[in-house]
Amino acid sequence: MIVQDSVCSELMRGCEEILPVPELEKKLQKGIPLKIKAGFDPTAPDLHLGHTVLLNKLRQFQQFGHEVIFLIGDFTAMIGDPTGKNVTRMPLSQETVLENAKTYQHQVFKILDPDKTTVAFNSQWLNKFNAVDLIRLAATHTVARMLERDDFNKRYTTGQPIAIHEFLYPLLQGYDSVALKADVELGGTDQKFNLLMGRELQKHYGFEPQVVMMTPLIEGLDGVKKMSKSLDNYIGINETSEQMFGKIMSVSDELMWRYIDLLSFKTGKEIQQLKQSVLEGKNPRDVKIDFAKEIVARFHDQTQAEFAHNKFIERFQKGNIPEDLEELSLVIAEPIALAQLLKQIDLTASTSESIRMVKQGAVKVDGDKISDPSLKLPIGKSYIIQVGKRRIAKLSIQQAH
C-alpha cells in the first residue's frame, strides 16, 4: 500500500522539526502500522493544553492506523528530567509518581483512543537493570557528548553542580526507545537531545533508528512565555467548561490562530479556509467562539460547550457584573500608574503586559475603556476593573498610614 502524500503532509503539519524527513516518508510508505512512542514523566498531577499539542499528533497517527505507545516514565520521573533546569532537580517518591500516573491515564484518554493505545511504564525494563547493565549503557556516551546539551553546558561553565544521575536521565530515556523498538518518537522541542539519544542508542544496539518528530512549545495566555502552571498562564484540561471557555476567549486574535493551528482537530485545509473567511470580513471573535466550543466539547461535551458559551455572553458581552466577583484590596502611600497597579493585584503577569492590554483597549475601569497606562486611580475609592474577557475584580484602594 502506498501512503498518499496528503497523509504524510497532515502528519508532518504543525511539527517544529523532523529528523530526518526522508526516513519518516520511507517508513510511512511501507504501508504497515508503525510504533509511535511518546513519553511523559508524571511529575505533576494535571495536564494543560500545552501538553495536548503532542497528544493531538499521537491521535492523528492513530487515525491513520498506527500503534501509539503512551509511555509513562515512572522510573525516570524518580530521577527528574534536568532539561532546561539550572539546578539539580529533586527526585520524586514512588508513591507520588504512581498517583500522578493514574491521573495522567484518565486525562490522556480524553484525546487518545484507548483501544488503539498501549500504555507502558519504563519501570518494566529499567527496574531489571543491574550494575553491569547500567555501566554498559553509560559507556555508550562520553561526558563531552553530555556537555553538548545546552543546560548542562551552562551549568558546567558557570560552576553550578551537575549530579551524575542527571547524566543518566537522557541515556535511560533513550533506552526506552530500544526496549519498545520505536519507529517514531514524538516530543517537545526542548527534548531534542533526549530524543536523539534514543536514535543513537537504537543504532548502538543494532535496531533501525527511530525518526524524531518535535512539536512546538505553545505560548501561554500572555502570548509570550510557554504555557506553564508555575507561570499561571495555562488552560488546564480538567478545568470547568466556563473557565476553559473564558480563558480561550481572553487570548489575542494573533495567538488564537496559533492555538487553532496546534490544538484544533480541523485539517490544514479547513484552517486555511477559516483564515480566508476572516480576510473576507468574518469577525475573528466568531472564529474564537467556535474554537472555544470545540476545545470545551473535547474535554467536557457539546452541552457543556453551549452552556459555557451562554454564560460567557451573559457575563461579558451583555456587560453583567457577576455576583461572585472577586474582591481585592490594595494599600498604597500614593497613587500609582494603572499598568503597575494591574501587575500588583495580579490581573496581569507583568507591567509590560498591562501596557499592552491597555493599548489594545482591553482594560476597563467601572465600565469605561482606558487608553492611558499611566492613569492613576485616586486612593480611598473602590473600582470594578476588567482586563480582557475573563479577568474582572472589585478593587478597594486604601491609604497607607
Curated annotation (Swiss-Prot):
Annotated ATP binding sites: K229
Keyword Electron transport: no
Enzyme Commission code(s) on record: 6.1.1.1
The reaction(s) this protein catalyses: tRNA(Tyr) + L-tyrosine + ATP = L-tyrosyl-tRNA(Tyr) + AMP + diphosphate + H(+)
Classification via Gene3D superfamilies: HUPs, RNA-binding S4 domain, Tyrosyl-Transfer RNA Synthetase
PROSITE patterns in alphabetical order: AA_TRNA_LIGASE_I, S4
Domain S4 RNA-binding: 336-397
SMART domains: S4
GO cellular component annotations of the record: cytosol
Function of the molecule: Catalyzes the attachment of tyrosine to tRNA(Tyr) in a two-step reaction: tyrosine is first activated by ATP to form Tyr-AMP and then transferred to the acceptor end of tRNA(Tyr).
Protein name (database record): Tyrosine--tRNA ligase
